């Protein structure tokens, strides 16, 4: 059976300190990822706080804000939490922030993070997440997957 899946992805990115154009140019990603350079530029050039169709069935909304200001409830299926670690940005790894994430996820929604610190795991569990340790990507021994359960 060969049926075409036609799902749409609505990706919401929340960033308090975005990379500016000069910094982006210095990274030289256009020359590194040549085949996707136009998409990369489109993602960085599109306006903040507005939904953009990046590709057919892929929509991006970049929100210029702190996650602590997010008030969406039961809206997201997945959160990719790729902040600097708790040692560098302890304010992003608190029960307060994880409760906001828990509330913003739909039932059975998933949060993933490269941080596998015990304090992170405990804070996720304390707000209601079911937390699992997973094998990490190259360079990381472990990562965490937290699922919103009742």
Sequence positions of predicted segments:
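A short glycine-rich, Lys/Arg-flanked "PGG" loop and its adjoining helix->strand segment in the class I
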Residues: 91-108
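Conserved SAM/SAH-binding beta-strand->alpha-helix loop
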Residues: 17, 117
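Core SAM-dependent methyltransferase catalytic element
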Residues: 127-150
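Conserved SAM-binding loop of SAM-dependent methyltransferases across substrates and taxa
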Residues: 1-6
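A short SAM/SAH-binding and catalytic strip from SAM-dependent methyltransferases
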Residues: 77-91
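Conserved SAM-binding motif I beta-strand of class I
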Residues: 10-15
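Conserved beta-strand signature within the Rossmann-like core of class I S-adenosyl-L-methionine
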Residues: 78-80, 107-115
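S-adenosyl-L-methionine
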Residues: 23-73
């Amino acid at each position: 059976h060969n049926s075409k899946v036609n799902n749409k992805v609505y990706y919401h990115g929340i960033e308090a300190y975005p990379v500016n154009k000069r910094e982006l140019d210095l990274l030289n990603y256009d020359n590194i990822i040549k085949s996707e350079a136009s998409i990369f530029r489109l993602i960085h050039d599109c306006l903040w706080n507005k939904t953009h169709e990046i590709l057919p069935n892929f929509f991006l909304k970049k929100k210029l804000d702190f996650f602590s200001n997010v008030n969406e409830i039961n809206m997201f299926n997945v959160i990719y939490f790729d902040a600097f670690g708790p040692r560098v940005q302890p304010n992003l790894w608190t029960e307060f922030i994880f409760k906001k994430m828990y509330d913003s996820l739909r039932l059975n929604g998933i949060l993933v993070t490269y941080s596998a610190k015990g304090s992170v795991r405990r804070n996720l569990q304390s707000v209601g997440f079911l937390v699992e340790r997973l094998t990490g990507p190259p360079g990381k021994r472990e990562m965490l997957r937290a699922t919103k359960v009742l």
